[in-house]
Amino acid sequence: MTDPADVRLRDYTDLTDVALRRVREPREGLFMAESLAVIERALEVGYRPRSVLTGERWLPDVAAVLATYDSDAPVLVAEPAVLARTTGFRMHRGPMAAMARRELPSVAEVLAGARLVLVLGGLVDHTNVGAAFRSAAALGVDAVLVTQ
């Protein structure tokens, strides 16, 4: 990929605008998996990537993970400068995947069998949600509920 305006990169544009992202992601049925570990975890639990955006240096690992989960998602490879112009930030954590959202489970389904639950309410800025989920995983949380 050499042109940030390429239509295949649309899912990855303007990711630094919180208000736009909060509206666009749910409306378009996507979410971003930001790192190879997160992409792999999403694949592991059944999410399917619409595409993967990566730099050349991460391509072998991306290919291996996609092959493991029999994914035929398009892999978009670009130089660091094109990645930064497309996403609005320097991609230093590895590849990103635009993942297709599934229908949300009911609260009862999420809580079934859960002993320790994290509730995130009234979130205004999504930027710290990843840290909350990583902390929840480290603390053995069984379920996470996020209010609108």
Residue ranges and their predicted role:
Residues 1-67:
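Boundary-proximal intrinsically disordered activation/regulatory segments immediately upstream
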Residues 27, 48, 71-73, 93, ...:
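Short coil/turn connectors at secondary-structure junctions
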Residues 37, 44, 76, 102-104, ...:
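RNA substrate-binding interface of SAM-dependent RNA methyltransferases
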Residues 58-73, 107-115:
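Short, glycine- and charge-enriched coil/turn segments that flank and shape catalytic ligand pockets
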Residues 58-60, 81-85, 92, 102-105:
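A short acidic, glycine/proline-enriched capping/turn motif at secondary-structure boundaries
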Residues 67-88:
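A glycine-rich helix N-cap at a beta->alpha junction
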Residues 97:
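Glycine-rich phosphate-binding loops that contact phosphosugars or nucleotide phosphates
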